[in-house]
């Protein structure tokens, strides 16, 4: 869950005017549209609204034409639409104008940014975490855009692959009962019949093997954090221009921007922590295959494996959510990661970054034991998780089904 609050206004430039009159020349229009699916009907409402503001500010600085479509189910300030769920469109001409008007300055109220969005679709109240709703909304968003390539941002609460109400796999629409399982998300995306260039998970714990494997066939790349994402989320104003480029080097810049942002906050005395990875989805099958070899080779050890000495990423929600994948493999092999596994991990994780100094200090990550992916290691204390874990495709693909645990699994 996103955990801390930053004063929204202090994160924007303090300018005396509410209009930006710069007039740079545009380049050729970019062929990729970004879709942002924000499940904000919860205590992240203000933070996700701030994310829209940050995306808007990033668009205003672009020198090329670009389109952003946002699904918003939080509060609104748009006339009588308070009970509506909306698709909002923001289109920059690359000359400082958004939706045909000079871009608002970053100092303007965030509700004004929301009101500047062109309403291209309205829905009656609906559950945004329903797979049919998600599929329909994404289909509608794609229909409102002419390009054939799309990137996708998910913003909300999340807890990796876990299925219980307490942990929330993805999203929270109203009360804690209304959440979404990862397989349902994948089914919703598959129904759209469009492979996304990337998925950026602005949500906690999504940088795990279980999640990355689940989404491997619906997107080319995944940008995610294995631990909690701070409340402010990703600093879109710093990097959204890179997302539109649609290549690996620019996705790496997105990840680096995320790390640099939280390093800066830490240096200024604020609460700050971060992990982020760029995952090549097409490599997840090969990684699962290499992992299966390791799990089968060490199945007797894993039958009663003590994970307490491994780097663990559930800092606020208690232990066992995810241990570091590379650290586990190294530990099973006497402190060395076998070359075949190491080579495949390097092909899969194209960028990894973390904060070794964090505030609170318990959120610090040891870089030497950070591989860029977390993994759930079945433990007896999590019987409810284990029951659901066995239903995942990952359970068999990674070889966990080959382990005979010393306790009732």
Where do the model's predicted regions map?
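Residues in well-ordered beta-strands of folded domains
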Residues: 35, 153, 374-376
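Bacterial Sec-dependent N-terminal signal peptides
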Residues: 1, 7, 11-35, 379
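Terminal, contiguous helix-loop blocks that mediate binding/assembly
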Residues: 27, 139, 143, 158-161, ...
């Amino acid at each position: 869950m996103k955990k801390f609050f930053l004063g929204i206004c202090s994160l924007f430039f303090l300018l005396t005017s509410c209009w930006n009159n710069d007039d740079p020349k545009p380049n050729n229009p970019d062929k990729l549209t970004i879709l942002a699916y924000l499940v904000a009907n919860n205590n992240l409402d203000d933070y996700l609204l701030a994310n829209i503001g940050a995306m808007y500010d990033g668009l205003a600085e672009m020198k090329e034409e670009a389109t952003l479509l946002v699904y918003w189910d939080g509060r609104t300030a748009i006339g009588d639409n308070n009970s509506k769920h909306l698709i909002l469109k923001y289109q920059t001409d690359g000359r400082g104008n958004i939706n045909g008007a000079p871009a608002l300055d970053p100092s303007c109220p965030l509700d004004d940014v929301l009101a500047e969005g062109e309403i291209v679709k309205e829905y009656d109240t609906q559950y945004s975490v329903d797979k049919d709703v998600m599929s329909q909304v994404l289909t509608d968003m794609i229909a409102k855009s002419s390009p054939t390539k799309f990137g996708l941002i998910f913003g909300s609460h999340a807890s990796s692959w876990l299925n219980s109400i307490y942990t929330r796999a993805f999203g929270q629409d109203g009360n804690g009962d209304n959440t979404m399982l990862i397989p349902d998300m994948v089914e919703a995306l598959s129904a759209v019949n469009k492979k996304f260039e990337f998925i950026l998970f602005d949500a906690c714990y999504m940088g795990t093997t279980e999640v990355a494997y689940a989404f491997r066939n619906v997107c080319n790349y995944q940008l995610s954090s294995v631990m909690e994402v701070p409340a402010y989320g990703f600093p879109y104003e710093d990097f959204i221009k890179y997302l539109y480029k649609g290549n690996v080097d620019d996705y790496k810049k997105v990840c680096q921007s995320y790390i640099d942002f939280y390093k800066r906050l830490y240096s200024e005395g604020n609460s700050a922590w971060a992990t982020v990875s760029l995952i090549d989805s097409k490599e997840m099958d090969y990684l699962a295959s290499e992992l299966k070899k390791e799990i089968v080779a060490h199945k007797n050890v894993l039958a009663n494996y003590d994970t307490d000495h491994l780097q663990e990423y559930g800092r606020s929600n208690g232990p066992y959510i995810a241990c570091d994948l590379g650290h586990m493999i190294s530990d099973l092999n006497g402190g060395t990661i076998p070359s075949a596994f190491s080579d495949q991990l390097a092909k899969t994780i194209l960028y990894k970054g973390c904060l070794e100094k964090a505030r609170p200090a318990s959120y610090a990550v040891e870089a030497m034991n950070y591989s860029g992916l977390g993994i759930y290691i079945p433990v007896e204390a999590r019987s409810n998780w284990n029951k659901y874990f066995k239903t995942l495709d990952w359970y068999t693909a990674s070889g966990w089904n080959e382990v005979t645990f010393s306790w009732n699994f």
